[in-house]
UniProtKB/Swiss-Prot annotation:
Pfam families: Na_H_Exchanger (PF00999). Endosomal Na(+), K(+)/H(+) antiporter. Mediates the electroneutral exchange of endosomal luminal H(+) for a cytosolic Na(+) or K(+). By facilitating proton efflux, SLC9A9 counteracts the acidity generated by vacuolar (V)-ATPase, thereby limiting luminal acidification. Regulates organellar pH and consequently, endosome maturation and endocytic trafficking of plasma membrane receptors and neurotransporters. Promotes the recycling of transferrin receptors back to the cell surface to facilitate additional iron uptake in the brain. The keyword Zinc-finger does not apply. The lineage of its organism: Eukaryota, Metazoa, Chordata, Craniata, Vertebrata. The chain crosses the membrane at residues 21-41, 46-66, 127-147, 165-185, 204-224, 236-256, 278-298, 302-322, 323-343, 365-385, 387-407, 430-450, 466-486. It comes from Equus caballus. Homodimer; phosphatidylinositol-4,5-bisphosphate (PIP2) and phosphatidylinositol 3,4,5-trisphosphate (PIP3) could be involved in the dimer stabilization. Interacts (via the C-terminus) with RACK1. Interacts with CHP1. Keywords: Antiport, Cell membrane, Cytoplasmic vesicle, Endosome, Ion transport, Membrane, Sodium, Sodium transport, Transmembrane, Transmembrane helix, Transport. The gene is SLC9A9. This is Sodium/hydrogen exchanger 9. Residues 42-45, 148-164, 225-235, 299-301, 344-364, 408-429, 487-644 are cytoplasmic. One of its GO terms (molecular function) is potassium:proton antiporter activity.
Length: 644
């Protein structure tokens, strides 16, 4: 009897390991297919279906196979046993079965209407990820890469517009979607499709907050390939990066909104408490991420880690990851922390790294971002069939489609009108139309929706979110190139040539009476540049003027301690260096790169310019169109473009 029991236990353990291997193998094959498809698309210059859309297609096919080609394997999984002596759910439970004690761990709470779907298919159950995997493993590399690869010159030049779209625009989208969905919910109650009280207004606002998270990864990838006008790219990229962080904190704030009396009534105290939570969590997460980046910058500045690039890269990665984990452990939002950690690391720490570490960190996070994004989009396709508690309601889905388009319009057009009143460099109508078109939903909305699927309203939200992501990625992502052509938006813009048309921030700071900036945030940019140039850069990096020349005399000992020896022989370049440089720039030792003690002495002088590279025919079709000012025209041959 004992031998049989041990045999059954070993068999169950082996079966569990087998299912885990099958799960990893499925995702491995999906990623292999996705990579081969990406190569095929790039080789044939096919832009009407992005790699994320292809990953979703493969996920759908695999989910369809798993759903209908696998048989039920676990009959006992849906059986409910009563434990009358337990008044709460313990984290671990020891159960004595025929004189053998087994340990079980708490997994999640299951509603009464979700018990029946648990009868049966263990493979489908295994293929349903723990939602925390998305937030703790897959999303941090994506968000960090967004901050680390930020082109800060254009970002700061459009800072006011980006903040307006990200904060005020997200709030507008949340409220508009919530109001429209509340109207449709009332119609569903009137039609008998919902019971009165199943869906509260706070649930509609919760859905509005998660659907306000835009993720135009498909559009931005095509923009990058075609070298679209940098202002449009920066506005859309900056909005999407900050919008993700705002939407996550906003979703959490709405979820903890709890009026004392009626959950469907407005409570001023609970409302202001939620607003306070939003501001406190966002500010705390920002401070946490920035603090870890400052610590990393100081460590890389005052140690000789640059002599050991492997150790330097490892420390950089672990401290960046610690920003996320520390924020989560402190009850803050790790996604916001890791975003601003990436931005600050790019601005300061990157300048202290050796050339090897610069290349390694850039490639490491670019690779992690690529894998994480494709795993999420593959899983989206899988989840349509492997998730066993879908609730599809035609009226709710119709309302959601209408709501996201109306909310996007209420976000972009009124805010652009207000911003243009104060901007010298206006946001043209074709930019506004493109931003309206680019309001795709993606990884963030999906991750927020799947985090809680226990109640029927949350299951309906999750199922609807999946359909919205599929539609926007396939339709809007695939229509990006034709839309650029129709709106006559510049492509092939050389960033360096575009920047020559605008005065640098340093020149603006020295010639305030002579010239007026073309950017709406110039005064803020000048103030920040001056403070950063005189104090922060010299403290945290090897560049900038010596602190002995900028701090008061009584700070002499501290100034000498914090000033790098390289600062006495180096002057900060007139134009602030870009955060991330590409391989060609690293190869020629980019002229605006800050001093690093481990960098080779060879560098371009201040008055030297790299020879311009004339793009060949292949590069033109790939999107590297040279000098810019062109309009994209579609040829008769699909997937190709010509220049005007």
């Amino acid at each position: 009897m004992e031998r049989q029991r041990r045999f059954m236990s070993e068999k169950d353990e082996y079966q569990f390991q087998h299912q885990g291997a099958v799960e990893l193998l499925v995702f491995n094959f999906l990623l292999i297919l996705t990579i081969l498809t990406i190569w095929l698309f790039k080789n044939h210059r096919f832009r009407f279906l992005h790699e994320t859309g292809g990953a979703m297609v493969y996920g759908l096919i695999m989910g369809l196979i798993l759903r209908y080609a696998t048989a039920p394997t676990d009959i006992e999984s849906g059986t409910v046993y009563d434990c009358g002596k337990l008044a709460f759910s313990p984290s671990t439970l020891l159960i004595n079965i025929t004189d053998q004690v087994y340990e079980y761990k708490y997994k999640r709470e299951i509603s009464q209407h979700n018990i029946n779907p648990h009868l049966g298919n263990a493979i489908l159950e295994k293929m349903t990820f723990d939602p925390e995997i998305f937030f703790n493993v897959l999303l941090p590399p994506i968000i960090f890469h967004a901050g680390y690869s930020l082109k800060k010159r254009h970002f700061f030049q459009n800072l006011g517009s980006i903040l307006t779209y990200a904060f005020l625009g997200t709030a507008i989208s949340c409220i508009v979607i919530g109001l429209i969905m509340y109207g449709f919910v009332k119609a569903m109650v009137y039609a008998g499709q919902l019971k009165n009280g199943d869906f509260h207004f706070t649930d509609c606002l919760f859905f509005g907050s998660l659907m306000s998270a835009t993720d135009p990864v498909t559009v931005l990838a095509i923009f990058h390939e075609l070298h679209v006008d940098p202002d449009l790219y920066t506005l859309l990229f900056g909005e999407s990066v900050l919008n993700d962080a705002v939407a996550i904190v906003l979703t959490y704030s709405i979820s903890i909104y709890s009026p004392k009396e009626n959950p469907n009534a407005f409570d001023a105290a609970a409302f202001f408490q939620s607003v306070g939570n939003f501001l406190g969590i966002f500010a705390g997460s920002f401070a946490m991420g920035s603090a870890y980046a400052v610590v990393t910058a100081l460590l890389t500045k005052f140690t000789k880690l640059c002599e050991f690039p492997m150790l330097e890269t490892g420390l950089f990665f672990l401290l960046s990851w610690s920003a996320f984990l520390s924020a989560e452990a402190a009850g803050l939002t790790g996604i916001v922390a890791v975003l601003f950690c990436g931005v600050t690391q790019a601005h300061y720490t990157y300048n202290n790294l050796s050339l090897d570490s610069k290349m390694r960190t850039k490639q490491l996070f670019e690779f992690m971002n690529f894998l994480a994004e494709n795993v999420i989009f593959c899983y989206m396709g899988l989840a349509l069939f492997t998730f066993q508690n879908h609730i599809f309601n035609a009226l709710f889905i119709l309302g959601a489609f209408l709501a996201i388009f109306v909310a996007r319009a209420c976000n972009i057009y009124p805010l652009s009108f207000l911003l243009n009143l104060g901007r010298k460099h206006k946001i043209p109508w074709n930019f506004q139309h493109m931003m309206m078109f680019s309001g795709l939903r993606g990884a963030i909305a999906f991750a927020l929706a799947i985090r809680d699927t226990e109640s029927q309203p949350k299951q309906m939200m999750f199922s609807t979110t999946l359909l919205l992501v599929f539609f926007t990625v396939w339709v809007f992502g695939g229509g990006t190139t034709p839309m650029l052509t129709w709106l006559q938006i510049r492509v092939g813009v050389d960033l360096d040539e575009d920047l020559k048309e605008r005065p640098s921030s340093h020149q603006e700071a020295n010639n305030l009476e002579k010239s007026t900036t073309k950017t709406e945030s110039a005064w803020l940019f000048r103030m920040w540049y001056g403070f950063d140039h005189k104090y922060l850069k010299p403290i945290l990096t090897h560049s900038g003027p010596p602190l002995t020349t900028t701090l008061p005399e009584w700070c002499g000992p501290i100034s000498r301690l914090l000033t790098s020896p390289q600062a006495y022989g180096e002057q900060l370049k007139e134009d602030d260096a870009e955060c991330i440089v590409n391989q060609d720039e690293l190869a020629m030792n980019y002229q605006e790169q800050a001093a690093s003690p481990c960098s080779p002495p060879t560098r371009l002088g201040l008055d030297q310019k790299a020879a311009p590279q004339t793009p060949g025919k292949e590069n033109i079709y790939e999107g590297d169109l040279g000098l810019g000012g062109y309009e994209l025209k579609l040829e008769q041959t699909p997937g190709q473009s010509q220049l005007n």
